A protein has these predicted regions:
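N-terminal helix-loop segment corresponding to the beta1-alpha1 unit
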Residues: 1-158, 189, 194, 268
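Short amphipathic beta-strand starts and helix->beta connectors
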Residues: 30, 199-204
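Active-site-adjacent beta-strand anchor residues
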Residues: 47, 69, 167-171, 218-220
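Conserved Rossmann-fold dehydrogenase catalytic segment
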Residues: 103, 131-139, 160-174, 193-200, ...
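Oxidoreductase and adenylate-handling cofactor-binding alpha/beta cores
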Residues: 147-165, 176-188, 228-237
Length: 276
């Protein structure tokens, strides 16, 4: 959005961890992670434990719109760079603080990582086959989601025109990603079972294997689509499946019919029929 972003890296000769993480571009030996994280940013090195480093950070903050930090709660305060000192330099500064579990609470001082949030939020417990273990996502999902939450919250704070502290954490970001499920668990005691690629309120929905060993994804969250799929798989005349509740109650039979239909055709044939 046109922001001039200055990334502060630690003064240890290594810098940001993504500079050495994962795949490297063979053309310049720079990691793809760093190209993603560091793109469109200016970078500087500051030793925030030194007087010079703290002074330089305060100078930057004096003319900045936003400061984003992801230290454990209390770290900036111990460095004498907390909101009090920063707002003395710039009362309009938006300070966005990203942690594992928030600035307060019993887990505030714990280190936070994406995997912890994915497990503790219950997200991993929702994923996997009914007879299998919980599954973690194969990407840094929490990190990406929390970054979006932090960016949105920061923009809202900027729009207010008032200097303030924005408190964002990994765990709450994952909880809000899960829609009504946390509320259903808290208010109703609902414990969603693992359904593979399925979801509790829409049937059929999942991935199915074709005759040529490809996978196709099918979802029927709207009634017209559900009726069309049922007609294709031979269940269009079944009155018991005319409602979402009826299909959910008869999930196994509907899934078996869809699996059989898809398994007897190639991926191209299935897609052709579904887009007719």
């Amino acid at each position: 959005f046109g922001a001039d972003v200055i990334k502060v890296e630690r003064d240890d000769g290594v810098g940001d961890g993504t500079r050495s993480l994962g795949w490297r571009d063979p053309t310049d030996d720079v990691t793809l992670w760093w190209k993603l994280i560091g793109r469109n940013k200016r970078t500087i090195v500051l030793d925030l434990k030194s007087t010079e480093g703290r002074t330089n950070l305060l100078r930057l903050a004096a003319t900045a719109d936003v400061l984003v930090e992801n230290f454990r709660p209390g770290t900036l305060e111990r460095l004498h760079l907390g909101p009090t000192e920063l707002h003395e330099q710039n009362p309009d500064l938006v300070i966005t603080r990203v942690t594992g579990f928030g600035q307060t609470g019993p887990y505030a001082q714990r280190a936070g990582f994406a995997t912890l949030a994915e497990a503790m939020s219950g997200f991993a417990g929702l994923n996997g086959e009914p007879d299998g273990p919980p599954l973690l996502p194969p990407i840094a999902l929490t990190d990406e989601v929390t970054a979006l939450v932090a960016a949105f919250a920061t923009m809202v704070a900027l729009h207010s025109g008032r200097g303030q502290v924005v408190d964002v954490n990994l765990l709450e970001s994952m909880l809000q990603l899960m829609g009504p499920l946390p509320a259903a668990a808290a208010a109703l005691g609902y414990d969603q079972p693992r359904l593979g690629s399925g979801i509790p309120y829409s049937v059929p929905r999942g991935t199915y294997r074709t005759k040529d060993e490809q996978g196709v994804a099918i979802s029927t969250s709207s009634e017209p689509v559900a009726r069309r799929v049922l007609e294709l798989v031979g269940l269009g005349d079944d009155d018991g499946l005319r409602t979402s509740a009826g299909r959910v109650a008869d999930r196994a039979r509907v899934d078996e019919a869809v699996s059989r239909y898809v398994g007897e055709r190639t991926a191209a044939e299935v897609i052709e029929r579904f887009v007719e």
